[in-house]
Design a protein with these regions (language model features):
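Mobile genetic element proteins and their domesticated derivatives, centered on retroelements
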Residues: 1-2, 7, 25, 44, ...
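Short, well-ordered strand-loop elements centered on a beta-strand within folded domains, enriched
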Residues: 6-14, 125
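Active-site beta-loop-alpha junctions of metal-dependent nucleic acid enzymes
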Residues: 12-35, 40
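Helix-centered, glycine/charged polyanion-binding patches within enzymatic domains
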Residues: 18, 37-41, 45-108
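Charged phosphate-binding loop/patch that engages nucleotide di/tri-phosphates or the phosphate backbone
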Residues: 115-126
Length: 126
């Protein structure tokens, strides 16, 4: 999920539980498209690969992600901006407050995705 704030999701997708974060993150960044002005992209350390970072920079997105501790040449991290990443985590918590999303009753992906979309819309309108 790419979110603008603790209430607004920009783009999201549904993946299997065993799917890796890197390839999906690349697809989400591609879905955002190229931005006119630089936009800060607060990311989890799971998205800290060179390919994903380069893909974000090509689209005028400034990735704010900590580099791996073993990395020889760590990239700079804006710690003040990275602290704002908890807003996205709060959005996940709010979505999971909807019982149907949290318990995953639905067998079909499209039905589950519809309820996640509904939860995102309700959170945006709140």
């Amino acid at each position: 999920m790419v979110a603008l704030s603790c209430r607004d999701a920009l783009v999201w997708s549904l993946t299997p539980g065993q799917a890796g974060d890197g390839p999906e993150g690349r697809q989400l960044i591609e879905a955002i498209g190229v931005q006119d002005a630089p936009v800060y992209l607060l990311m989890d350390s799971a998205y800290g690969g060179n390919d994903l970072r380069a893909s974000a920079l090509e689209r005028n997105l400034q990735p704010i992600v900590p580099s791996h501790p073993q990395r020889k040449l760590p990239w700079p991290l804006d710690k003040q901006r990275y602290r704002q990443r908890n807003e996205v985590e709060r959005l996940f918590r709010r979505i999971k407050a909807y019982r149907r999303v949290f318990t995953r009753y639905d067998k079909l992906d499209v039905v589950y995705a519809a309820f996640v979309s509904m939860a995102l819309i309700l959170e945006h309108l709140r």
